[in-house]
Amino acid sequence: MRALWVRQTSLETEESIRRMVASASTSGFNTLFVQIGNEAAGAAQTFDPVGETINQAHTAGLRVHAWLDIARVAPSGELPFARDHVIYQHPEWLMVPRALAAELLPVDVHSPDYLGRLVRWTRSNTDRIDGLYVSPALPEAASYLAEAVRDIVRRYPLDGVYLDHVRYPAADFDYGARSIAAFRDMMRGQLPLTERQRIDSVQALDPFAYPNELAEEWRSFRRAQLTALVVRLRSTAKSVRPGTVVSVAVTSDAESAERENLQDWRTWAANEFIDALCPMVTGADVTGQLSQIHALAAGRPFWAGIGANRLSQRETIDGIAAARRAGAQGIVLFSYDSLISPPKGSEFLTGIGRGAFAGS
């Protein structure tokens, strides 16, 4: 696979789509990861950029994978304009950071103040979180995400679905009242009576007693919710279109992914819960990172995500070569729009094609 991530901003007109498809094709790419926002499902449009992209790409012999944000439902910058967006309709689904949990607990979840405080905290901590996330621990939120995937795969003849942001932003997230209640209810059915009574007595003074007292179980619970979501999304996509290839963005370091983001991608690979892993590799030791992934991927294909927007043309070509040496079955470059814009320009992609894909 030789793929490009393509942002929505590159799909605004038929002509911009034509230029993008032509540029990708002539540069030797064979796949497009096309960004589709959460609001796209079911939206009424006079011009359908996704449908037009698929038509033009398939005509040119390119495959198209839908690039979907999953748990992250809104970026931390400009909030969605539409008032029927999930963050306004269901603020109770949003993950709450541990640092804000006690402050939000007495606030009515449906009051503007609740969402306002969460947004302000998110914007003041952009080094830790890049937006608003829904909790996979809540059945309604998981169903919402599954239905969004179902609708997109049903509407479009996609070749694949790339699931982005299938993770917790950090290990100290998802301390909302409903997520903690779900964990508490599960643990109450498993704990010996005396231990349950002890923690219940602590909870009378500390509403976060269950995650505090059962820290490892709390981590395992959230990790399991994320894994269950991955399984459900893949099953949903394939139930609509069996040939759909489902890939997942993963943190390249498996231990860090599990520790910091509760993203147990080794289990996903070992149990064939996904069709392909897509780690974003950074830094000088690309070969080392990808060799580790190859060793842990349990035979699952993996595609190296390369941030070419931060690299020179030579560095990008070298990164592609390193990915191939490490056993990657494909590469995905970030991103079309940044690679054709100044200071790079249109020759950047064609140069990569000549340097990395000649003879492919």
For the regions a protein language model found, what residue spans apply to each?
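Aromatic-lined substrate-binding rim segments of carbohydrate-active enzymes
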Residues: V21, V34-R72, F221-V240
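Boundary/entry segment of secreted carbohydrate-active catalytic domains
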Residues: M1-M20, A24, V250-D253, N309-R310
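Catalytic domains of carbohydrate-active enzymes, especially glycoside hydrolases
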Residues: S16-A40, R155-G160, T267, N271-P279, ...
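Active-site-adjacent "subsite" loops/lids of carbohydrate-active enzymes
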Residues: L11-E12, A66-R155
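Active-site neighborhood of glycoside hydrolase catalytic domains
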Residues: E140, Y144-A148, R154-D164, P169-G288, ...
